Amino acid sequence: LAGARVYVTVNVVVKWDEMQRVLRLIRRAWILGADAFIIQDWGLMAQVRKTWPEIECHVSTQANIHDTRGVAACKKLGVGRVTLSRELTKEEISTISKLVVELECFGHGALCFCYSGICHMSSMRGDRSANRGACAQPCRLPYELLNSKHEVVSMGGIDRLLCPKDYCTIDDVPDMIEAGVGSLKIEGRMKAPEYVYSVVSSYRQAIDAAEKGVDNQADVAR
């Protein structure tokens, strides 16, 4: 009704006995008007592409695609877009973009300490799998650093040792566009609507300014 595109996230590892139910859900959502599906599980991706080639599929960042070989494999499957790993440099993104596949990169949100899609820390510490959409975020908890004698090392009051600052690329938007990024992913899950509106509006303004070749950082900062 609002004229917005709807991308349905299916970015979890799918168990064998869940596959048929997930396929039915995807088909139903497609009939209802979903524009694309963001998928992590390679078995699910292959099955959707084989059964319904008309359905547009995007590769989730949870698939940990981080080089040209991975993107080439995605291209061979016929995916519409690849969401790259958050850890890549602009130079690496630029190299990957030469494969002529639409690329999406994280623009704003939490930056995991571990690599997306291959982190088992939540499973080991909290019995909740990050690859099943249930990350307990143990990397955001306070920790102590011990030396070889098991003595606590002073970190000057810092105890969030595994918790990087949130990801913010608004100052890098022109460089990301030049590198070949076609879409920016902004974290909005479990965020207040006001927060989502503010962040998305700021990035929209920055993207429009970059495409026009003007410096709009002062306006964005306000």
Regions found by a protein language model. Give the residues of each.
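Residues at the C-termini of beta-strands that transition into short coil/loop
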Residues: 61
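Conserved nucleotide-cofactor-binding alpha/beta core module
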Residues: 68-69
